[in-house]
A protein has these predicted regions:
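Short helix-loop capping/hinge segments that flank enzyme active sites or metal/cofactor-binding pockets
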Residues: 47-67, 242-259, 306-377, 432-442
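An N-terminal boundary/leader segment
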Residues: 1-29, 38, 270-273, 279-282, ...
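Structural helix-boundary/capping segments
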Residues: 89, 93, 144-258, 272-281, ...
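Glycine-rich, small-residue loops and helix-cap segments
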Residues: 48, 54, 89, 148, ...
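Sec/Tat-exported extracytoplasmic proteins
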Residues: 3-13, 23, 30-37, 41, ...
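Flexible glycine/proline-enriched surface loops and loop-helix/loop-strand junctions
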Residues: 66-69, 122-128, 135, 185-193, ...
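Acyltransferase
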Residues: 31, 81, 263-289, 311-337, ...
Length: 485
C-alpha cells in the first residue's frame, strides 16, 4: 500500500519528491515481521510499521547516508545509528530515507529549504509550488502525504518544528540527550537531536519512546558530563503514551510569549483562537516576557560554526577511505569541483566560515556557548518557567508556507519571527501541533518548556489536538487555493 502511494504521489515530475531512497529489502523484512506477528511475537506498537528516516541518519544496510550531498553519494555507514538500532529492535520497518535541505541546511546563506544536490527539491503537499520548509523537508512531507506511518527528522534549530508545522503535522524536538546523536551526520553537537514526526501527537509519542535509551557512544544520554550536556538517565521513558490525556489542559499554567507572535494578523488570529480553546479547557494563561532571541543570534551562529568543523570532521573521518571526502575541507573542494551540480542555486558560505574556525578550545567559542545558555536557559526559559510556575510556554510555530524560489532562496519567507531558537539553543523540548490554516496552508502552535519536560508537553499538545481536531489531509494542489480563507 505505501509503496503504491509513493509511486503515485511522490515520484514523477509532479510528485512531492520527499523520498531520496527506498529500502530494497523492505518487502522481505515486512514478510519476516508479519511472520513474527502471526506466531504471536509482537515487539510493540511499532511492529511492522513503516518508518521513513532522514537521509542524514546512518543505516548499515543497502541504503546510503548522504545528508543529500553528492559528495557522500553511495556512502554506506559502518553501523546503524543508535536510534535505528532501537527502531529495528521495536519491530519498525525502515522503509527508506527522506530528502532534506542539503547538509541539514548548513551549507550556504541563501539556501532553498528542501533542496539537495542528490535528492532535488521536496515540495509541500498542500500546494506544490510552496516550500516544505527544512531541513527535515522530506520527513514532514512524506508523513503529511501518508507515505509512511511516522518519520524521523533531525533539528539543530527549527529543522523539525518548521517543516512539521508547514506540512500540517505534529513534530517533537526533544531535550538534547533524550535521543542519541551517534550515527547522525552532525551540524553541531550542542544543539543537534533527532525527533519524531507524525500525523498525530499519539503516533509521535509512540515513536519517541521507541528511540530513547542510554548509548555508550553518546554521553549525553547516560550521565551528566556538564551543565551543557545534561543527562537522560532516569528522565527518559520508553512509553510516552501514558501521558496522552485528552483533559491535559485542565489546571495547566501556560505562558503566552507574545514577543514570538510576529505581525501576521492571520497567524495571530489562529493562535488567539487556540488560546481560547486552552482557557475553555481549564488552562490558566499568563502573559510572559522572554529576552529577544536576536540577543543570542550571532553567538548561536558562532557556536554552530565552531562545532560544525569539529563534528563533521569527526564523522567523515570515521567513514574511512570508502568515501570521496574525509574532512570539511574535502567537502568544500569537492563542491567547487562539481559546482554545476552542487552549487547551481546557492553557495557554501556557512561551510567556508566553519572551515576558518579554530578548535573547540578557543575562548571565543567558550564565551559564545556560555552566552547562548545564559540567555536561552538561565535568563530565558528557566527564568520564565520558574517565575510564573508554568507548565509550558506557547507561541506560533511559524507562518504559511512561502513560494519556492530557487533564485533567491528562502529570502521570500513571510514569517517575521523566530520561535524555534529558544528551545533549540537551550537544548530544551519543543512540540508543534496543527492549529489552523491560511488559504489551505497549515499553521502550527508551539509548546516548549524546560529540560526533560516531554511528558508535560505531550500531555498539553495532545489535549489541544483532541479539543481542536483541525488537521485536514493535503490535496496536492498545484498552487494554494485563494478562494479558501
Amino acid at each position: 500500500l505505501y509503496l503504491e502511494r509513493i509511486a503515485r504521489i511522490d515520484e514523477g515530475e509532479n510528485g512531492i519528491n520527499s523520498i531520496i531512497e527506498l529500502n530494497p529489502e523492505a518487502l522481505p523484512i515486512a514478510e519476516r515481521l508479519d511472520t513474527e506477528r502471526s506466531k504471536g511475537k509482537v515487539r510493540g506498537p511499532l511492529h511492522g510499521i513503516p518508518v521513513l528516516i532522514k537521509a542524514n541518519i546512518d543505516t548499515s544496510d543497502y541504503m546510503s547516508t548522504t545528508a543529500g550531498s553528492l559528495a557522500l553519494e553511495g556512502s554506506i555507514a559502518p553501523q546503524d545509528a543508535f536510534l535505528v538500532k532501537r527502531l529495528r529492535e521495536a519491530g519498525a520497518l525502515i522503509l527508506g530515507k527522506t530528502n532534506l535541505s542539503e547538509w541539514a541546511n548548513f551549507r550556504g546563506k541563501n539556501s532553498t529549504s528542501g533542496w539537495s544536490s542528490l535528492g532535488g527539491l521536496t515540495r509541500n503537499p498542500y500546494a506544490l509550488d510552496r516550500t516544505a520548509c527544512g531541513s527535515s523537508s522530506g520527513s514532514a512531507a512524506a508523513v503529511a502525504s501518508n507515505l509512511c506511518a511516522v518519520s524521523v527528522g533531525t533539528e539543530t534549530d527549527g529543522s523539525i518544528i518548521c517543516p512539521a508545522q508547514t506540512n500540517g503535522i505534529a513534530g517533537i524536538k526533544p531535550t538534547l540527550g533524550l535521543i542519541s546523536r551517534s550515527g547522525i551526520i552532525p551540524v553541531a553537537h550542542s544543539q543537534d537531536t533527532a525527533g519524531p514526526m507524525a500525523r498525530t501527537v499519539a503516533d509521535a509519542a509512540i515513536l519517541l519512546g521507541a528511540m530513547t535509551g542510554v548509548d555508550e557512544a553518546d554521553a549525553a544520554t547516560g550521565r551528566a558530563l556538564s551543565e551543557v550536556e545534561g543527562s537522560s538517565k532516569g528522565l527518559a521513558y520508553q512509553d510516552y503514551t501514558q501521558f496522552l490525556d485528552p483533559e491535559g489542559l485542565q489546571g495547566a499554567r501556560i505562558g503566552v510569549a507574545r514577543i514570538l507572535f510576529g505581525t501576521d494578523k492571520r497567524v495571530i488570529k489562529i493562535i488567539e483562537d487556540g488560546l481560547e480553546v486552552m482557557k475553555s479547557s481549564g488552562a490558566e494563561l499568563i502573559e510572559v516576557k522572554l529576552p529577544p532571541s536576536d540577543k543570542f543570534g550571532k553567538s548561536e551562529l558562532e557556536v554552530l560554526l565552531y562545532e560544525n568543523k569539529s563534528d563533521l570532521n569527526g564523522y567523515l573521518a570515521s567513514l574511512g577511505q570508502k568515501v570521496k571526502v574525509q574532512s570539511l575541507k574535502d567537502v568544500i573542494e569537492f563542491n567547487e569541483e562539481n559546482r554545476k551540480r552542487v552549487l547551481p542555486y546557492f553557495g557554501q558560505e556557512r561551510m567556508e566560515a566553519a572551515q576558518r574556525k579554530r578548535g573547540l578550545t578557543s575562548k571565543r567559542y567558550a564565551n559564545a556557548l556560555a552566552k547562548n545558555h545564559r540567555l536561552s536557559r538561565l535568563e530565558g526559559i528557566d527564568a520564565v518557567m520558574l517565575e510564573h510556575e508554568l507548565d509550558a510556554i506557547v507561541c506560533p510555530s511559524g507562518g504559511p508556507a512561502w513560494m519556492i524560489d530557487l533564485v533567491n532562496g528562502d529570502g521570500g519567507r513571510s514569517w517575521d519571527m523566530d520561535s524555534t531558537s529558544y528551545a533549540a539553543v537551550a537544548g530544551y523540548p519543543h512540540i508543534t501541533v496543527p492549529a489552523g490554516y491560511i488559504f489551505g496552508l497549515p499553521i502550527g502552535i508551539s509548546f516548549f518548556a524546560g529540560a526533560w519536560q516531554e511528558p508535560q508537553l505531550i500531555r498539553l499538545a495532545y489535549a489541544f489536538e483532541q479539543k481542536t481536531r483541525v488537521r485536514v489531509p493535503p490535496r496536492f494542489l498545484k498552487t494554494a487555493d485563494l478562494r479558501v480563507p
